[in-house]
């Protein structure tokens, strides 16, 4: 029975003026003394730490299993701690029963049950809710194939940073790491007191993002601040924990870097890379016609495809691709953000070999595609004309003459020596109802369970929106949009005109049956071989010139008010109060 529900506004941004800088550990993350721990171990007494030989083998066998099946969320609520094996926490089980909250229930043409039967939309008891364009849904539990988090991923520190945030290969030369290491060397720990919050950048479902400066340096970061009490009351602590765990394991040029994270009594903070170029949604709105040229689209989606490929190799299903979540760095390249809706699953990478006629033809001609940066023109990295055979090798000084050479036997259907890495978590299944209306895959709306194929559906919607300035199934309302996704065929507008390969790629990605969808079997490897990406040098894509480089950002600082020692300061007028409202919550720092 559906109920009419008003769309819920995003949570209020935390009042940073009320932040308390604490230097003690959070009471919710308690440790056990060695003497108490010894009393809890089978075969040991509290007086003696000598192990019982009869239970040593049992301890060794069970220790690894227990460590891999327990996830501490930092909450005092026992329901927030995952049980061992495939058991589902009570809180998550309760959320899954009402995972659809209020999206399909608002209509007058037909009853919800009739519409669900006609279009195959899954029904749910109780109230229903589906997130809007800027709102995200609740993350439910996944199948038993999903990999549980380990307790080692959770920091036991409160007001100081996690020691697990260390320099990673792709950011080895980042000046921001040097600034952070300098503060750590000087003070030992890194906490909220070391940052100055300058302005608010945006607000999401579980927190707000602020532009921050590391004190004593000119290094700027994006700090995501989450109110722990609000997360607990809205049952979103697990989502915040999932995002932190995913960010900790990422090391990719097109994915965010988690420099540090820390907690106070009230807030949980993630310190990440600041992207001054904004997001692709804002950038698209500034384009003529509100859509990108096809060459620019090819650049952006190629980098996103590599980021998605990396995530799937780690067993991470993103589930929230949209222009608002694609940020533009200062050099014009992109960065994928927001991982609170992501799903972590098991994956088995496979290395296979496949035939490649182009590579075989090059082998016969004694040539190869050059992989040296000095041999490639970066400005035309994604132009088809740049994909011409070349070689970095000089002539052989002691080669035999052609008369002395013996002809090599022709090999029919020879397999290319270039292997393909397939790492697609295709067996993952989740019943969660998460995402954005216009980007939801049909299998999510029908409630049939979904896996990694939903990322390739959203990738197709994303490609369509960048090319045409709108999504393909958008209706007059959220309810109509869902019905269009299920029952309406894919159509292309007459204008703007795009290439046949672009339309063909979108058709392959927006197949309503997930088993027939492009990328379902071989993942990003299959998509990268589509003619739309012809001429893209995947190995050197970071050397390509971006379509647009954002202008340098000038950081505006609040003016310092002079302090008079002779007369008491007068109360500010209403106009002055309104003009300085944007800085009031940062005065504390």
UniProtKB/Swiss-Prot annotation:
Enumerate the Gene3D superfamilies for this protein.
Phosphorylase Kinase, domain 1 (3.30.200.20), Transferase(Phosphotransferase) domain 1 (1.10.510.10)
Query: Keywords in UniProt for this one?
Result: ATP-binding, Kinase, Nucleotide-binding, Serine/threonine-protein kinase, Transferase
Question: Per the record, where are the segments of Low complexity compositional bias?
Answer: 142-165
Q: Known PROSITE patterns for this protein? A: PROTEIN_KINASE_DOM, PROTEIN_KINASE_ST
Q: Provide an example Pfam family for this protein.
A: Pkinase
Q: What is its EC number?
A: 2.7.11.1
Entry GO MF terms:
ATP binding; protein serine kinase activity; protein serine/threonine kinase activity
Q: Does this entry carry the keyword Lipid metabolism?
A: no
UniProt biased composition (Basic and acidic residues): 91-100
One of the record's GO cellular component terms: cytoplasm
Give the source's domain of life in one word: Eukaryota
Where are the compositionally biased (Polar residues) regions? Answer: 15-36, 63-76
Under the heading CDD domains, the entry gives:
STKc_phototropin_like
| Annotated ranges, domain Protein kinase | 195-533
Under the heading SMART domains, the entry gives: S_TKc
Q: Which reaction does it catalyse?
A: L-seryl-[protein] + ATP = O-phospho-L-seryl-[protein] + ADP + H(+); L-threonyl-[protein] + ATP = O-phospho-L-threonyl-[protein] + ADP + H(+)
Q: Which segments carry the region annotation Disordered? A: 1-167, 551-589
- Residues annotated to bind ATP: 201-209, 224
Q: Which family is this sequence assigned to?
A: Belongs to the protein kinase superfamily. Ser/Thr protein kinase family.
The record's annotation in PANTHER family points to: FLIPPASE KINASE 1-RELATED
UniProt function note: May play a role in the regulation of metabolism and signal transduction processes.
Name under which the protein is recorded = Protein kinase G11A
Q: Which organism is it from?
A: Oryza sativa subsp. japonica (Rice)
């Amino acid at each position: 029975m559906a109920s009419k529900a008003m769309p819920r506004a995003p949570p209020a941004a935390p009042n940073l003026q009320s932040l308390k800088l604490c230097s003690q550990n959070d009471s919710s993350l308690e440790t056990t003394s060695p003497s108490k721990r010894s009393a809890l171990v089978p075969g040991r007494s509290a007086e003696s730490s000598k192990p019982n030989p009869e239970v040593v083998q049992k301890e060794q066998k069970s220790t690894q299993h227990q460590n891999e099946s327990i996830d501490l969320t930092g909450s005092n609520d026992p329901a927030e701690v995952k049980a061992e094996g495939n058991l589902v926490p009570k809180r998550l089980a309760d959320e899954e029963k009402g995972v659809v909250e209020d999206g399909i229930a608002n209509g007058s043409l037909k009853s919800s049950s009739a519409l669900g039967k006609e279009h195959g939309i899954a029904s749910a008891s109780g109230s229903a809710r589906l997130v809007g364009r800027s709102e995200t849904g609740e993350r439910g539990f996944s199948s038993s194939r999903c990999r549980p988090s380990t307790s080692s991923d959770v920091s036991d520190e409160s007001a100081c940073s996690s020691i697990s945030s260390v320099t990673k290969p792709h950011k080895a030369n980042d000046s921001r790491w040097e600034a952070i290491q300098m503060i750590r060397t000087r003070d030992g720990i890194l906490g909220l007191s070391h940052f100055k919050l300058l302005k608010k950048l945006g607000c999401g479902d579980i927190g707000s993002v602020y532009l921050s400066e590391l004190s004593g340096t000119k290094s700027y970061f994006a700090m995501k601040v989450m109110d722990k009490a609000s997360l607990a009351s809205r049952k979103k602590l697990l989502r915040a924990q999932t995002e932190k765990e995913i960010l900790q394991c990422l090391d990719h040029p097109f994915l965010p870097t988690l420099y540090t994270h820390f907690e106070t009594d009230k807030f949980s903070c993630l310190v990440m890379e600041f992207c001054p170029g904004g997001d692709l949604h804002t950038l698209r709105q500034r384009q003529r016609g509100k859509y990108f040229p096809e060459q620019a689209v090819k650049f952006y989606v190629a980098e996103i495809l590599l980021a998605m490929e990396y995530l799937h190799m780690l067993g991470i299903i993103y589930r929230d691709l949209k222009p608002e979540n694609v940020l533009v760095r200062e050099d014009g390249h992109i960065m994928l953000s927001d991982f609170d809706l992501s799903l972590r699953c098991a994956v088995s990478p496979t290395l296979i070999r496949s035939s490649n006629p182009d590579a075989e033809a090059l082998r016969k001609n004694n040539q190869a595609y050059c992989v040296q940066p000095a041999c490639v023109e970066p400005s035309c990295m994604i132009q088809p004309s740049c994909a011409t055979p070349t070689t970095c090798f000089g002539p052989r000084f002691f080669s035999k003459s052609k008369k002395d050479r013996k002809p090599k036997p022709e090999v029919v259907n020879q397999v290319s020596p270039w292997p393909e890495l397939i790492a697609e978590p295709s067996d993952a299944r989740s019943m969660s109802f998460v995402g954005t209306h216009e980007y939801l895959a049909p299998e999510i709306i029908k409630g049939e369970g979904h896996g990694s194929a939903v990322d390739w559906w959203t990738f197709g919607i994303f490609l369509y929106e960048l090319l045409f300035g709108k999504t393909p199934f958008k209706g007059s309302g959220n309810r109509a949009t869902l019905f269009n996704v299920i029952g309406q065929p894919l159509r292309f507008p007459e204008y703007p005109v795009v290439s046949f390969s672009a339309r063909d790629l979108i058709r392959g990605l927006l197949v309503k049956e997930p088993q027939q969808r492009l990328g379902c079997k071989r993942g990003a490897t299959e998509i990268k071989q589509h003619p739309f990406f012809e001429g893209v040098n995947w190995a050197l894509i970071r050397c390509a010139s971006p379509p647009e480089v954002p202008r340098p950002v000038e950081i505006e600082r609040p003016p310092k008010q002079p302090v008079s020692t002779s007369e008491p300061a007068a109360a500010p007028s209403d106009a002055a109060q309104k003009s300085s409202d944007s800085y009031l919550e940062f005065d504390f720092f």
